[in-house]
């Protein structure tokens, strides 16, 4: 078996480009080899800031062979009455490059045709790979592409070299004016090169040993972790590893060397969040904490070389970080000399979103919406929630958030504590932007949860009123994330909030605006959008699609609104019910009842309200069903009020035998109109309760 290596050398790519580049190279080469019939055992992709290497092992040097039957014209056209080949047959043979002796008759459902067997494959795998390489490289996608020189070729960064070897032979091709060869380049300082690679098998040894490069991202990550942990342990602490930053720094170095530096202990007076953000965002460095969880006066950075003078390099990093921390201290002291009142006044000069007014307007709306939410959720301290809404965006005009925008909300909470606001308010301000994504936690405090809901609902209502509704992948105001965040917060906090009324109130608080959508229309679209996100959330949690659709389509009582908590509990109970052995037969029974009522309402024109007359109940089975319904009804209503959906589905099990007996022994659509309507109303009384739990008609069994 053979080996192949392709190394694409380029100027430093941003670290965030590398994971996608690895994935695309692996997928595109796998697809190209499969399409060409080149058998192989494995494909491995390694990336650094300056190179991407594709290593393919276990290659069959010869393309997979196969036999193909190529049909030609019908036999009646291919031969004349005397059985001699016609021009059609001769032309077919000539086109296929065979003699007439190679032609045979192929019988098909459509008749007999002449045909020829042709063997395909058997080509040199190296030649096929040489053809695939320029196509794959040129088509690689990047978040941003650039052009250099006088050509039109674009790539993530300028190409500098191409190494391509099939075993010990160069695979010749050209991309963007760069011709492939058998030469690579190492680390700029520890093994620049040029370095000759004699074979694909020798590639890693040359790059690592002679080039001073660690090409494997996982190995670089492990080196950073091991070196950083050892250095911190020697200083009596531990590194505060941030996964996203760790991923970034391993993609910034070909030769990673962790270095522990020191900071002036006086900077520890700054808030922990300020120190860490300054280290991480500006210097790509990690903080260090002691056994008690307090920050230590150290930081860890990652170099891209082994320094000759460690002390000198360390001193340089400390000097640069000190300047950053001095800026942070200045922002901190300046902000502490300000006040929330001053910041709130400044918010009136900060635009929220076009026609939707200023950030000051938004905070006044949030003050009222938080108070409404607190009352709806039964929170005792409505005033604290309202105060949190009013102060929620004040830190946006602070010096610190102006420099570190990722600290929005967090600094609001810190400043609230320093300026004497209640802890409830401070915690809410710090948590208002949670959850930041599908894997981010929701606010831990109830006040924070309500402020986050209010903020998201206000943004959604304003955008929908302006017709800014997400389409396709475009969602510039992250409205999908807002909707998902509201759903998660309500579910995880178990809040009983009518989301329809939430959006209605949020729209109303804007007052008179130059809306593109009337409030009533915007409300309908908001509901549809929110329910679609809720459905996606439940499916992502592992619930079956049909069960989710059935639970969300339940016919809740008029005026019930959108109760997300109840929907989640209803779906969980339905999912449990679906695991019962008799689930399928139960669904068929209840679905039959639902379908009869739906059909009579849509096609028969019957107006059914569930009120039936005992005097018209003639059959034993219908009397038994009526009695069972009346016995179960008070229990159903009590369980419904308690949101005990598991027990409600248990009641369905109790009802089912009576329903089955009804269908077995009673002719619903009888000739007597009065009796027929009475029986339909009996079924309507059943489905009025069934429909609250799920749309059984939507379930396919």
From Swiss-Prot:
It comes from the Bacteria. GO terms for cellular component: cytosol. InterPro entries: DALR_anticod-bd, Gly-tRNA-synth_bsu, Gly-tRNA-synth_heterodimer. GO terms for molecular function: arginine-tRNA ligase activity; ATP binding; glycine-tRNA ligase activity. The keyword Ligase applies. Its EC number is 6.1.1.14. SUPFAM superfamilies: HD-domain/PDEase-like. It is found in: Cytoplasm. Keywords: Aminoacyl-tRNA synthetase, ATP-binding, Cytoplasm, Ligase, Nucleotide-binding, Protein biosynthesis. GO terms for biological process: arginyl-tRNA aminoacylation; glycyl-tRNA aminoacylation. Pfam families: DALR_1, tRNA_synt_2f. Tetramer of two alpha and two beta subunits. PANTHER family: GLYCINE--TRNA LIGASE, CHLOROPLASTIC_MITOCHONDRIAL 2 (PTHR30075:SF2), GLYCYL-TRNA SYNTHETASE (PTHR30075). Belongs to the class-II aminoacyl-tRNA synthetase family. This is Glycine--tRNA ligase beta subunit.
